[in-house]
């Protein structure tokens, strides 16, 4: 298995796990409990700049990104 992929949710800064790593394709994640999708993708190998929408020219501040 690859790195544990998470999304940093935009509302409160909490991290929540993404099912199937989908957040690194869509750039969003579903917040625990409320089902809202928001946030920016990150994982152990990549940290994206603010406003990054993975899949459309993600600019990475650290590491290499498949975005």
UniProtKB/Swiss-Prot annotation:
One Pfam match: Metallothio_6
InterPro entries linked to this entry: Metalthion_4_echinoid/annelid, Metalthion_4_echinoidea, Metalthion_dom_sf
Protein origin, superkingdom: Eukaryota
This protein's UniProt keywords: Metal-binding, Metal-thiolate cluster
Any one GO molecular-function label of the UniProt entry: metal ion binding
Coiled-coil stretches noted in the UniProt entry, renumbered to this chain: none
Signal peptide: none
Its biological purpose: Metallothioneins have a high content of cysteine residues that bind various heavy metals.
Family affiliation: Belongs to the metallothionein superfamily. Type 4 family.
Protein name per its UniProtKB record: Metallothionein-A
């Amino acid at each position: 298995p690859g790195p544990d992929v998470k999304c940093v949710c935009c509302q409160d800064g909490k991290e929540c796990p993404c099912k199937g790593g989908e957040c690194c394709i869509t750039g969003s994640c579903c917040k625990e409990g409320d089902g809202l999708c928001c946030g920016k993708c990150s994982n152990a190998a990549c940290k994206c700049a603010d406003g990054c929408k993975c899949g459309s020219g993600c600019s990475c501040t650290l590491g290499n990104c498949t975005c």
